[in-house]
A protein has these predicted regions:
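Peripheral terminal and linker regions in Fe-S/redox and tRNA-modifying enzymes
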Residues: 1-568, 669-686
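A glycine-rich helix N-cap at a beta->alpha junction
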Residues: 108, 754-764
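Long, charged low-complexity segments
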Residues: 554-569, 583-673
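Alpha-helical protein-protein interaction scaffolds
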Residues: 568-577
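An N-terminal amphipathic alpha-helical segment
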Residues: 695-728
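Amphipathic alpha-helical interaction surfaces in cytosolic regulatory modules
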Residues: 716-723, 740-756
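Core SAM-dependent methyltransferase catalytic element
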Residues: 770-776
Length: 776
């Protein structure tokens, strides 16, 4: 195990002091968050409910430690452990008053959460087979442990522009996560010397890319110097203004590979002169019996529920048995399961019996069903668009009932993510799905399909083969697997074996996937069949504005991204879709959310064409689209030109949501009015209370202007707040009225992130809130 940092005790004490101050309102939420997040403690979707993320380098934890984690979770009120896609474990559903106790008890067990969140070096990934893979160059685990011990103790590991992710691969033929991390290290042996092939700048999140090959071979002794140099390089060159463009890959996008490598070389050369080496030997464990077995203990979506006491008792017995066998007998995996390893042949039957007793159905199911990975999605993530867990469950059920021989899929990877942020890593899978919004006469949940990532040989992201309604995805998956099984049968007659991933990486596999996707492209209109307009796991008709948004600005830009991506998808294929998404793309910046296509075109005409931001030459095109809809015949060049004009305008938008003419970037654009509600919004907006004029929450502070935002959903309420602030002078005070719940939880915090001062927020007797904001 890695070495616990010496400062951990005082860090935990400081956490406790800040938590008490926060509870007593003597410490601000911002100050508390700034400390607790790098300590690996996050607030969950429900206010004042917390999660502690335990660092488990390489997924390593001893059976005795995991038993202790279960005890700690239970005794502190948690009902759930969660295994993450970085092979670590979280304790969820904690009250703040119990978190310090959790951290202290974890420390006593040789575990820590420090560095589990924020702009830090996150949990380091190592292949789950490292140390037991007969084809590995060498076991990378001791190097990851030694590196973790150094990094969690260094202050500059907590001051970076954004998080840094590191991954090791022990087998030179299986690059895996080393190909998509900020620093990827693939074990190699050359001329008897150990070293690493080094990739830099990879990332599977938004604007994804595989890493750039920095070193074909780097001696293991240079490992510390490399990572130290990367921290210094990142601190000096990372983007601290825009967290959405702050990861290392954005430096490559900005400067190009050659210039970026030159800068890294400078820092690397300086660190090599210091000649500091990692103490790897302290972390080497005796080699286990090479004849030992490995078994996967599956957990659906990585969840280890603690409420079923009978099952939990079986898990405790299993962990106790593993403790008798040895300490290196389990690892968390990036597929959110536990891999049992180094199981002697004479104990294998005992271990398998307990694993099966814990969850017989999961233990006996085909491996592919245990390998479906999903982000939390819109049911718990405030940035989510689609209910990704609902879709994952639907895929799971459809495959399970298909009657197909799923054993032929071996350990195929299927990944689902609910929005373009790509937290579920769909572009690093055999078959991936990315949630988005599409429209007919009504919005509906959809998924862009990706196939064929190469995580085995040379790193390569999956490629898109189409976009279909969420409703059709399970049937698409079953049809795709049927086709694969047919192809596998043909291959078998020719004496060859084909994996699901290899097939989807082939041109023939991609072509088959694209052809099957085309069968499911069209859906009926809403008035003809409402089923495709419901998301999986939801009983309400799909609507983007129903999704919660934690950071209002993030939600705003996410909605813009949906339309921007839809424009790119539709170019050359569907001119009406290009016109529709171009017209809708920037309406959110004016606090508008029309519920039908006619409303979109009317609002675009009023707020962008008539306001002078977009040329009036596009008016006939907009009127045609409004009148003829998807059945019309449109000039492709005009549709594309409109989209280009809207995207160019978006690039001129400043932090106050004001636009400048793309043709004359220096000229002032027309002043945007605070958004006028559409006719539909006027109907929905509640009538003012008997005392129509909002009253100040602080009689000593008189507002310059007041705005009633009750009944306005997130992020529209934030947009309207920004637009109001844009018309005020620095130091002026804006008073807004917000509903209880998400509006008061989200808007003040997002306003603070913009640099404005929230003077006060007070809940009124009627239940709504009055908030005073001083413009920066």
């Amino acid at each position: 195990m890695y070495k616990i940092p010496e400062t951990l005790s005082q860090d935990i004490k400081k956490f406790g002091d800040l938590a008490k101050g926060y509870a007593a309102s003597t410490v601000s939420g911002t100050e508390f968050k700034a400390f607790r997040v790098p300590m690996g403690v996050y607030e969950q979707r429900k206010s004042e409910v917390y999660m502690a993320r335990i660092r488990a380098t390489g997924g390593v934890i001893t059976p005795q430690q995991l038993l202790k984690v279960i005890d700690i979770a239970e005794s502190n009120g948690s009902n759930l452990l969660h295994i993450t896609t970085r092979a670590e474990v979280q304790i969820l559903n904690l009250d703040l008053k119990n978190v310090q106790n959790v951290l202290t008890q974890l420390q006593e067990a040789g575990l820590a959460t420090k560095g589990g969140g924020g702009n830090t070096i996150r949990n380091i990934i190592v292949s789950e087979f490292s140390g037991i893979d007969p084809d590995e160059a060498f076991d990378a685990t001791p190097y990851a442990m030694a590196l973790t011990s150094e990094m969690v103790a260094e202050a500059d590991s907590y001051l970076m522009p954004r998080k840094m992710k590191i991954a090791f691969a022990s087998n030179p033929s299986v690059v895996d996560y080393a190909g998509i991390n900020d620093i990827g290290l693939v074990a190699e042996v050359k001329n008897g010397q150990r070293g690493f092939k080094v990739y830099i700048g990879g990332g599977a999140g938004s604007k994804p890319t595989v890493g750039w090959l920095y070193k074909d071979f780097m001696p293991v002794d240079d490992l510390y110097a490399l990572v130290k140099a990367m921290k210094k390089f990142f601190n000096a060159n990372g983007n601290r203004k825009n967290k959405h463009k702050a990861r290392i890959r954005y430096i490559f996008y900005r400067l190009g590979k050659e210039e970026t490598f030159k800068l890294i070389d400078k820092y690397f050369d300086e660190e090599l002169k210091a000649a500091h080496k990692l103490d790897v030997e302290s972390y080497v464990t005796p080699k286990a019996d090479s004849n030992g077995s490995t078994i996967v203990l599956p957990f659906k979506w990585g969840n280890v529920w603690l409420e079923d006491k009978e099952k939990l008792a079986v898990l405790r017995r299993l962990l106790s048995l593993l403790s008798e066998i040895g300490s290196d007998t389990l690892r968390f995996t990036t597929r959110q399961n536990i891999r049992l390893r180094n199981i002697p042949e004479n104990r294998k039957a005992e271990v398998e019996a307990l694993a099966k007793e814990y969850d017989a159905e999961a233990f006996d199911q085909p491996v592919v069903l245990s390998n479906i990975v999903t982000c939390t999605g819109a049911d718990t993530c405030r940035l989510g668009i689609c209910l990704s867990k609902g879709l994952a469950n639907a895929i799971f059920a459809a495959l399970g009932k298909s009657g197909l021989d799923l054993s032929l899929l071996d350990d195929a990877r299927i990944n689902v993510t609910g929005c373009p942020n790509l937290c579920g890593q769909p572009l690093w899978s055999d078959l991936g799905f990315v949630g988005k919004v599409l429209h007919t006469d009504h919005a509906y949940p959809a998924y862009q399909i990706y196939v064929g990532a190469d995580y085995v040989n040379e790193p390569k992201l999956a490629e898109s083969v189409g976009t279909i309604a969420a409703y059709n995805v399970p049937r698409f998956v079953v049809d795709l697997v049927k086709r694969f099984i047919d192809v596998t049968g043909i291959a078998a007659t020719l004496g060859s074996k084909l994996s699901f991933g290899a097939w989807l990486r082939s041109e023939a596999g991609k072509a088959d996937a694209e052809a099957i996707a085309r069968r499911y492209t069209d859906i009926p209109l809403f008035e003809d069949d409402k089923n495709p307009y419901f998301d999986w796991g939801s009983e309400e008709v799909f609507k983007v504005t129903q999704r919660g948004k934690p950071e209002c600005s993030a939600g705003l830009f996410d909605m813009i991204t949906v339309d921007n991506d839809s424009i790119n998808d539709a170019r050359g294929k569907d001119n009406y879709a290009v016109i529709f998404h171009a017209s809708r793309m920037l309406l959110v910046t004016r606090g508008l959310d029309p519920q039908d296509a006619a409303g979109v075109f009317d609002a675009f005409k009023e707020y962008f064409i008539e306001a002078g931001y977009i040329s009036k030459s596009y008016l006939p095109l907009i009127e045609q689209a409004k009148a003829e809809g998807s059945e019309g015949k449109y000039d492709a060049a005009q549709a594309e030109a409109l989209a280009d004009a809207v995207i160019a305008l978006y690039k001129t938008m400043d932090d106050s949501l004001q636009f400048h003419s793309p043709a004359e970037a220096t000229a002032e654009a027309p002043k945007a009015e605070a958004a006028k509600p559409s006719a539909e919004e006027k109907k929905e907006e509640p009538a003012p209370a008997a005392k129509a004029e909002p009253q100040s929450a602080d009689s000593a502070v008189k507002p310059t202007r007041s705005k009633d935002l009750r009944g306005v959903l997130c992020p529209m309420n934030f947009v309207r707040t920004k637009l109001e602030l844009a018309t005020l002078q620095s130091g002026d005070i804006l008073e807004i009225l917000l509903d209880d719940g998400k509006p008061i939880e989200n808007v003040p915090g997002s306003v603070k992130l913009e640099g404005h001062e929230v003077i006060s927020q007070k809940q009124e007797a009627e239940g709504h809130w009055t908030v005073l904001i001083r413009k920066k």
